[in-house]
Amino acid sequence: MENVTVVDHPLLKRDLTLLRREETPHGQFRKTVSDAAAILAYEAMRDIELEETSIETPLEQTTGYEIAEEVMVVPIMRAGLGMVDGFVRYVPEARVGHLGMQRDEETYRPVDYYSNIPSTIGHAHVFVVDPMLATGGSASFAIDHLKEEGGQDFTFACLVAAPEGVQKLREEHPDVPVVTAVLDRELDDNAFIRPGLGDAGDRIFGTRES
């Protein structure tokens, strides 16, 4: 699919297997989400801007590189919180915003309940993270909100995407690339991704028994 990167990596495939497995306990699930997010971050940040800098090694002067643009990570709460540590692992200076959203289980439409976004968003490359891209409603709504806050440069990163969600983002935000670990088959009648991995938020935080 255009503007979609499916990251092909053996460790990511291993992690996805753990995440899909119903009997994986929430502690291991939470750690695996973070580990998988770090692999996604490696790929999602491939085109991040660098600038040269002169440094001294123990032996001589040479040229090195520093990140030239501000990096911001905005998780769609609550499940997106599980991906933050993975994304800031390589860029500890990244700013982190928070956007609280939940899905209305009758209309399947997103409802926001919290927003705290750094004021520097207009100068940052913003990585919007959420484990699941299902209908695309929450992702599109979040990006709308962040653009209203002044954001201009975005990447959306998820662990599992449905074709319907990808299509919605392509239609409503064609300027936002999607990076995912896997593109699953479809949404079911309840707007859950199949085969999917269940409710990522519940499984990360252990808030509901299987």
UniProtKB/Swiss-Prot annotation:
Mechanisms controlling activity: Allosterically activated by GTP.
Catalytic activity of the protein: UMP + diphosphate = 5-phospho-alpha-D-ribose 1-diphosphate + uracil
Binding site for uracil: I193, G198, D199, A200
Cofactor binding annotation: Binds 1 Mg(2+) ion per subunit. The magnesium is bound as Mg-PRPP.
EC numbers: 2.4.2.9
GO biological process, one term: uracil salvage
Cofactors (names): Mg(2+)
Biological or metabolic pathway of the protein: Pyrimidine metabolism; UMP biosynthesis via salvage pathway; UMP from uracil: step 1/1
Pfam families with a match to the protein in the record: UPRTase
MF term (GO), any: uracil phosphoribosyltransferase activity
Residues annotated for 5-phospho-alpha-D-ribose 1-diphosphate binding in this entry: R78, R103, D130, P131, M132, L133, A134, T135, G136, G137, S138, D199
CDD domains in alphabetical order: PRTases_typeI (cd06223)
Keywords: Allosteric enzyme, Glycosyltransferase, GTP-binding, Magnesium, Nucleotide-binding, Transferase
Record InterPro entries: PRibTrfase_dom, PRTase-like, Upp_B, UPRTase/APRTase, Ura_phspho_trans
Enzymatic class: transferase
Function: Catalyzes the conversion of uracil and 5-phospho-alpha-D-ribose 1-diphosphate (PRPP) to UMP and diphosphate.
Name assigned to this protein: Uracil phosphoribosyltransferase
Protein species of origin: Salinibacter ruber (strain DSM 13855 / M31)
